[in-house]
């Protein structure tokens, strides 16, 4: 099967030998589904693959359908929103904080550092000329801006998922049934939810 070969060779995703608790697997599936749903809502056709399979001890993942780079601030913030969507999805469906989302939070934090330098002016103001470092006051100010923007984008992801809950649940169901969904599967699911 070509999909199986793609998963193993390109993405290095193996069928897991260990049994994952069914409740935990449902949360993993909604987490991954949330990334895919937000990506598809913001940029239809942009998600290439979403899976609950694992790689190096990490279960679940998602990849864009093609190499896409943010061309502007809006696209960049869409990427951060998609990154935060897994956590928002678990909160929406299960009413609990997704404590497994630390890698996503770290990624969102890194993306926000880039956003501040390139789009928010954080890289151009507050520099102390003597040692070419930011002042403590400026660092604190930048962290406050970043934190507020992350909260805003998390709420944006939550709202997108709330407005597309049937799509989210259908993708979760598809992941629980098939482990992996491709771009074409997501398109069919989305069409059935409209």
Question: What are the roles of these predicted feature ranges?
Answer:
Residues 1-7:
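Conserved AAA+ ATPase small/helical "lid" subdomain
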Residues 16-30, 36-194:
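Soluble catalytic regions of large protease machineries
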Residues 8-14:
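Non-transmembrane, extramembrane segments of multi-pass ion/lipid transporters
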